[in-house]
Amino acid sequence: MPLVRRSVAAASSLIEAGSLTDHLVDQFVHRMGYHPSKSEVKSWDMSIRVLVGDLQDAGLESVEMLLEYRLPLNSKRADVVLCGVHPRTGEESYVVVELKQWNTAIPVDGTDDVIFSESFNQPRLHPVEQVRAYCEYIADMVGMLDGEGEKLAGAAYLHNAVDEAVAGLFLMEPSQHGQLFTSSRRQEFLKFLRSRLDQKPGADAADALLNSAIKPSTQLLAVAADEVQRREQFTLLDEQQVAYSIVMRAVNRAYGANTKQVVVITGGPGSGKSVIALSLMGELARRGRTVMHATGSSALGLMHE
């Protein structure tokens, strides 16, 4: 879910009234229970203003903006997800945009995807790799996409930087899910946006994304099942196999009766709770069921739908 959802035109009106950033802060406090950092608030105030202006210049005022979109079942947030209609196919089209205020940045020696800048005091993930991963994660976890990334595109927009100041970042190969733009390439950025989004209203596309079931894609489940089932070290012993069988029985009964059951497996450190959960995950995924596991700092639980 985003902190704020508005059309480009509506977001522009809030910016002119000086209230968009305040609205983002209010929603952040309401959702998270604490105040965002000063740097984050400054980023909202400056970067979103630039993006909205670019979208207006591209003639995309009816596109829907999801500001600070939280990734499904994850604490990470994409800066902006633009929702609209693809100008060629007429289907839903989404553009994930990561906004950076950096003036300079260079690759870290010996790495392909780590960068450093005077704007921050520690290494960061290359913004193209960041937005690419966000696109792939969304495709894998949003049911309406089911692992198909064709409706998604990604862009890292360094709107304060010129090409010369971040030249090393262009060494990373661009793709549909990850492209790099700077202030020097603003016209290319507008062309990119128009290639992915039509002038038609994007409200329906936003509704489709936000109302979609959250579940791992068929492709992701197949990979998980294959990976887990191939690991010979997941041999269940004694009570572990008993617990596994009890859970499978509960799943089968719940599935047949269209009900829900909760099975709690207890045990100390090293007793095999995680092994049981991963074995269940692999077997259920292999059977074509929607299955997810969520981990805490000291335990791993299994969620099955």
For each feature predicted by the language model, list its residue ranges.
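N-terminal pre-P-loop "Q-motif" helix
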Residues: 217, 232-261
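Glycine- and acidic
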Residues: 113-122, 225-233, 261-266
